[in-house]
């Protein structure tokens, strides 16, 4: 998606350790118009999938998923929580994922009330690096008997292999910007097309 690539080039900051900082528009301050355009792009890509639910993971995926849902007949958005809470009652699906950004493992939890057998799920997230978070969401869907119809990612770090592995596993993955390489010293960012 050219618009997203331009924003990454203009406002993204490459940090050491393969970190791409895009908090000016994606995951701290949110550009809702950009999110709307992203949702429209995913709706076009997944238009034949009959999505009944969108699943993301807290926190950065929530805004993107909610705006995207308006392009999918306002289907419900469920976000997996990263910590147990007194607000999470009843039976739950739980798995554990390792966060590249946080450099630690954490639980991922969804109430069984909100993820059901037969749900046709679109997974949405802001970043895809090694695929650990998405594999956790896929595992939650499998536990529920839900069908993963597709995966929508804002920015994929193509050089970290998670996207390639998901494609090889047969998932319909639509990453709107795929970073092929980036250099913390020069700030250079190259995209895959």
UniProtKB/Swiss-Prot annotation:
Enzyme class label: transferase
Binding annotation for 5-phospho-alpha-D-ribose 1-diphosphate: 129-133
Keyword field contains Thylakoid: no
Disulphide bridges: none
GO CC annotations, alphabetized: cytoplasm
Pathway assigned to this chain's UniProt record: Purine metabolism; XMP biosynthesis via salvage pathway; XMP from xanthine: step 1/1
Keywords: Cytoplasm, Glycosyltransferase, Purine salvage, Transferase
GO biological process: purine ribonucleoside salvage; xanthine metabolic process; XMP salvage
Catalytic reaction list: XMP + diphosphate = xanthine + 5-phospho-alpha-D-ribose 1-diphosphate
GO MF annotation, one: xanthine phosphoribosyltransferase activity
Binding site for xanthine: 20, 27, 157
InterPro entries: PRibTrfase_dom (IPR000836), PRTase-like (IPR029057), Pur/Pyrimidine_PRTase (IPR050118), Xanthine_PRibTrfase (IPR010079)
EC number: 2.4.2.22
UniProt xrefs under Pfam families: Pribosyltran
Record text on subunit structure and interactions: Homodimer.
Function text: Converts the preformed base xanthine, a product of nucleic acid breakdown, to xanthosine 5'-monophosphate (XMP), so it can be reused for RNA or DNA synthesis.
Stored HAMAP family: XPRTase
Annotated family: Belongs to the purine/pyrimidine phosphoribosyltransferase family. Xpt subfamily.
PANTHER family to which the protein is assigned, alphabetical: HYPOXANTHINE/GUANINE PHOSPHORIBOSYLTRANSFERASE (PTHR43864), XANTHINE PHOSPHORIBOSYLTRANSFERASE (PTHR43864:SF1)
Annotated protein name in UniProt: Xanthine phosphoribosyltransferase
Lineage: Bacteria, Bacillati, Actinomycetota, Actinomycetes, Bifidobacteriales
């Amino acid at each position: 998606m050219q618009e997203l690539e331009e924003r990454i080039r203009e406002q993204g900051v490459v940090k050491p350790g393969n970190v791409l900082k895009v908090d000016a528009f994606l995951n701290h301050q949110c550009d809702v118009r950009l999110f709307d355009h992203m949702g429209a792009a995913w709706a076009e890509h997944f238009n034949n999938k009959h999505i009944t639910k969108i699943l993301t993971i807290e926190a950065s995926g929530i805004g993107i998923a909610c705006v995207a849902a308006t392009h999918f007949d306002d289907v419900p958005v469920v976000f997996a929580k990263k910590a147990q809470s007194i607000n999470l009652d009843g039976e739950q699906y739980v798995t554990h994922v390792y966060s590249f950004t946080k450099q630690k493992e954490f639980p991922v939890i969804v109430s069984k009330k909100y993820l059901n057998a037969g749900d046709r799920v679109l997974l949405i997230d802001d970043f895809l690096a090694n695929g650990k978070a998405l594999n956790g969401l896929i595992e939650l869907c499998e536990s529920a008997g839900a069908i993963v119809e597709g995966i929508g990612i804002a920015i994929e770090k193509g050089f970290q292999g998670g996207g390639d592995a998901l494609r090889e596993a047969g998932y319909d993955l639509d990453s709107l910007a795929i970073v092929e390489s980036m250099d913390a010293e020069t700030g250079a960012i190259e995209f895959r097309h």
